Structure formats: C-alpha cells, structure tokens
A protein has these predicted regions:
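Conserved P-loop NTP-binding catalytic core
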Residues: 40-108
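Phosphate-binding P-loop
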Residues: 16-22
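Short, conserved catalytic or interaction motifs in soluble domains
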Residues: 16, 50, 219
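The conserved Walker
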Residues: 31
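N-terminal pre-Walker A segment at the start of P-loop NTPase domains
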Residues: 1-15
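Conserved lysine of the Walker
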Residues: 35
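Hydrophobic anchor at the beta1->P-loop junction of P-loop NTPases
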Residues: 27
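Electropositive, glycine-dotted interaction segments
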Residues: 88-224
C-alpha cells in the first residue's frame, strides 16, 4: 500500500495544497517555505493511527488546534482542518478523508467534523453517523484510531502507523548528552545506536550503495569512510 494523492486545507502555512505522490517524491524550496510542515501531514496521520496516539494526542503534540490550523482558516473550508488522501494497494483503491474543527465550547477540543472511508468506490464509513449525533463525545476520537471501529479499513490504519520520519541533525547526532534517548527519534539522537545495531553485512551493503550514489552526484566525492 502507498499514498498516491494528497489534498489538505488549512494545514499550518498552507491554505490549500494538492498533489500526486509517486514512488519517490522530492520536495524542494527555500527556508521557511513549509517543506517540513508539508511532511508533517503524514506524521499527523501516523500519530492518530499509532499506538497510544489518537486525534487529541496528535493535535496536542503540535501545540493545539490554533497552532496546526492555518491563519487562512477563517475564510477557507469553513475553518475546518482537512486532510484527504488516496491510497493504492494492489488492485484496490482507497480514500481516507478527515475534517477537524474546534468543539466551540469549554476547552475547545478538536473534534471530527467529517470522517470518510471509501474502497473501490464503495463507502465504508461516513461520520458523523447516528451514534455520533446521539453522543457527541464520540466525535473527539476518529474511527481510524479505534481497533473496535476500523475493522473494515484496518489496513489503512496499519499503513499510517508504519509511517516513519527522519530529519537527521548532525549537532544532535554528536551530542553526548543524548546517549540515552527514546527509540526512533526523528532527529537522529539514536542514529549511531541504530547503525551499531544493524548487522555489519547489511550496514556495509547500504553504505556501499550510498557511496556509489554520492560519487555520481557530488563532484570530487570519494568515500564515506
């Protein structure tokens, strides 16, 4: 399974963004153009679907709905934060759409405004449904994050849960104070640990392929070692 198309509204510094996703995608732009914000859409879906995650947690990690939602939101898409992805899994085509709004009262929690799942043109889920209308607290969670509710589209949840993000920062990799860190730190504090844990034969093969690619792309480059 892989994502083939992405559309989003009111995400970070983007009013609207939409593009196809090939097997390999390069995102190029000047500093502060929003490259990391764009990639964070995929991390956002992973944080919702992942173990111990969920919609509330994914939004809180980013500083709350005010931080995540674009300043354009007041005049765009009714103020909703919208993520709409198309996926391909063999012969099957999937679509997952999530629209989020503020609760509008109390702590203004993020709630589901719309959640849609379509497989091969057949609608598997559309929220809010009758249960949501009877108990609005249910809208504080997506069905994507609930094992009891995502049976018919669990392959999507599992796919999002496997999303990985790496943004290696040399200063963090070399920082001795970060010798003991949580696993899978995206900024590389456990990068050396991961390298050492990789089988030498596998590690050498990977480094060899990287070295060949760098020789072809970087004038004067000779070796990684």
């Amino acid at each position: 399974m892989r994502i083939t198309h992405l559309a989003a509204s009111n995400w970070r510094n983007f009013k609207n963004v939409e593009f196809d996703v090939g097997e390999r995608l390069f995102i190029v732009g000047p500093n502060a153009a929003g490259k990391s914000n764009l990639l964070d859409i995929f991390r956002f879906l992973a944080d919702i679907a992942g173990q111990g995650g969920g919609l509330a947690s994914a939004v809180d990690r980013r500083g709350g709905l005010k931080k995540v939602r674009s300043l354009f939101a007041r005049t765009n898409a009714k103020g909703r934060l919208v993520v709409d992805v198309t996926l391909r899994d063999g012969d099957d085509s999937w679509r997952y759409r999530l629209s989020v709004k503020g609760e509008g009262k109390g702590p203004n929690r993020p709630v589901v405004d719309e959640e849609l799942v379509v497989k091969n043109g057949e609608e598997l889920l559309r929220r809010p449904d009758d249960r949501d209308l009877m108990d609005e607290v249910l809208l504080t969670q997506t069905h994507l994050e609930q094992i009891a509710s995502n049976q018919s589209f669990r392959s999507i949840a599992d796919y999002f849960d496997r999303v990985q993000y790496f943004h290696l920062v040399p200063q963090i990799i070399r920082d001795p104070s970060r010798a003991v860190v949580a696993d899978d730190d995206p900024f590389g504090s456990d990068f050396i640990t991961q390298m050492n844990a990789t089988a030498p034969r596998t590690r050498d093969a990977w480094l060899g392929r990287m070295q060949q690619a760098l020789r072809a792309a970087v004038p004067g480059f000779e070796s990684l070692t």
